[in-house]
Amino acid sequence: MAPIFDLLQRRKGRFVLWSPASQSVPRLILGTFKATPSPGAVTTLFTGDLSQTQNGLWELASDTIQPPLQNDKVYHYWFEVDNTYPTSTGSGKIKITDPLAYTVDYRQFADQPRAASMQPPAVIKFRDGKLWPCDIDGTEVERVPDPVQSQVPPNNQMVIYELPASWAKSGPNGKQIDRGTFADVQALFDKATPGVRFSSISAVRKEAIVADLGINALELLPIADSKYQDQWGYSTAHYFAPDADLGSTASLVDLIQTITPSTRLILDTVMAFGHDPYIYAAFMQFHLVALDPDHPNDPLQKFAEPGNADSYTSHNQGPRNPYGGSLWRYIKNPQQTYDPQTGQASLKHPPSWSFHRAHLHRWLLDFGVSGLRLDSINNVANYNFIKYYKDYAWQLHQARGGSTNKFIVIGEELSVPKDLLTSGTLNALWNEPFQGRIRAAIVGEAADGDNFEWTVRKMVDCTLDGYTDGAQAVNYITSHDVEGNRKERLYNFLSNCKVSDIERRAKLAFACFLTAVGIPMIFAGEEFCDQMDLDISEKQSDPVNYERKSDDWRTRVFNYVATLVDLRKNCPALGVDDTSFIHVDQSRGGKIMAWVRGTTNPVVVVANFTDQDTPGAQYFVPNWPDRDRNDWREITQNRAVPAAWVGKEPLMHWEAKVYTCWKAGAVNGQTNGVNGTHSG
């Protein structure tokens, strides 16, 4: 049975505001939304005081409201509170969104710029004497069933697809950029779903492009509600609500039910800073002012706390960055106030710790989430909190009968501190050095002070670089952080390196990437060599252009990648850490190499990192395992290898070949070769 979260339970029959700040009595402002005249507005029906039932907890029972709430009716509401923002002026009162809102409604603001101070009303439905979460049209959404563990891919066989909401399509004046919706994402998995804003794109309307790719874990860039419409959602405002611009909660549930259980949902969460209502309702309890030495005369700076360790990043590498929001406060003395998790009167941790556990509770139990990616751990800068959060995620997962190898908490900390893994603070890290090594290798360079051979060795086997298990390392050629030198999309990187054979190099990169030890993560669009449409400085707006997938050469890259994805997620040899290098050709500068993954029915990769084909009709690779077997296959070309040619096939320049004797069958309760058209 799942743990009870007291604050969330209370909301079923009451309007509840948890605010440990000292303040005057908050008020509920409640009404109904009328769509006409456009853009619509909320008509106020009731204004009344909340009562303090515990220190820091304010409530108003729904059955005490007069006139009585109507059954089966949708209501919109705000809380009116003291404005605690450090530089606030004026009346001292402000209407705020319920910090726990499951749905928010921006319709009354129409096309107004969404300033950080904008507070949309929360939405709730009154039915049978209780308050029910609902969409703005009144639809009540059932929670997603717990993932069926026998059908969930294990961590060591995941292939993650990192998908932003910003997409591009052709318009009358060139490229038109828009945000995809949950329905558009569903269309990438389901041919029967046409999508909404991108139905004009063949890859969205006629194909199930991501299903065809074959990934089995989807990481949508933050889907909790953000006020900003032109970015990827790293400015979370309403942590419990799906992003209103991406669609309704019902459409999110439709998406999840389409992809699960065979595809895992990874939740991307931003907890270094927020744009949430507590900035106004209880600033000093939940937030702190960021240090800004470049603007010492900014009025906010007199409220900054240079003596507080909470103001600095991990390892004191400089001030934390709020990126236009407000930093979450993670260091604060215990308070004799309401604990929203236990319901007791003594809060043992800073309020932000409990707030973040509360929305974690919501997402894991209501949406079947089976993994987390925590953004910018060094900017959160509190490893004790991260472990506290991770431990609760695992408690929730295990309470629903979850398997130990079918849930994961991944952290983004680009200095890759392995102590976060050995201490149990996190399960995995983004393996940032992998990106540098693979990009160096495909242009014939070494990286990180190693020679070329060791650049490739560490790229292929992360256990040579401090990891103790491949499931601790999330590898990527490209991530959504496409800003900076050698971080851009693969197409742009190769173009900037004056590479003319981009298709060949991209295939080489993916052959190494999808056979390496670690969890592979594909940034959306890289599977067909998408390119950047915007200036590199606009990384959180740069769109994915699925129209490009129809280019002939890009379709070839896509099919090549899909073939290897199918192998990666199904072949047992790629789900273990066992790796041995059997050949380094010193006569060619150590740049033709061969390595073996796994022991039983292994995978052998032979790669040529030079601009020269191997000479002669044969290229002999010594130490080839099971050379006498007659069932070797080359995966990327989907062909059998004649027994006389095992370990002897030539290589073209910048080419990798991937061999195995393994054949598709039942593995871990799953049927292999799901994407049969791409299977090797």
How should these model regions be labeled?
Residues P222-A224, W232-S235, T258-T263, H359, ...:
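Active-site-proximal helices and loops of the catalytic beta/alpha 8
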Residues M1-R14, N55-I160, A168-G180, D184-A187, ...:
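The feature marks proteins involved in alpha-glucan
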Residues L17, P602-F609:
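Short, well-ordered beta-strand segments enriched in hydrophobic/aromatic residues
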Residues Q472-K498:
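Active-site clefts of carbohydrate-active enzymes
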Residues Y85-V148, A281-Y338, D448-D465:
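Core domains of carbohydrate- and sulfate-ester-processing enzymes
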Residues S19, A643-G676, G680:
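C-terminal beta-strand-rich structural cap/linker in extracellular carbohydrate-active enzymes
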Residues S19-V25, P625-R627:
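Short proline/glycine-enriched turn/loop motifs at strand-loop junctions of beta-rich domains
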Residues D146, Q151-N155, P164-F367, I377, ...:
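Substrate-binding/active-site clefts of carbohydrate-active enzymes
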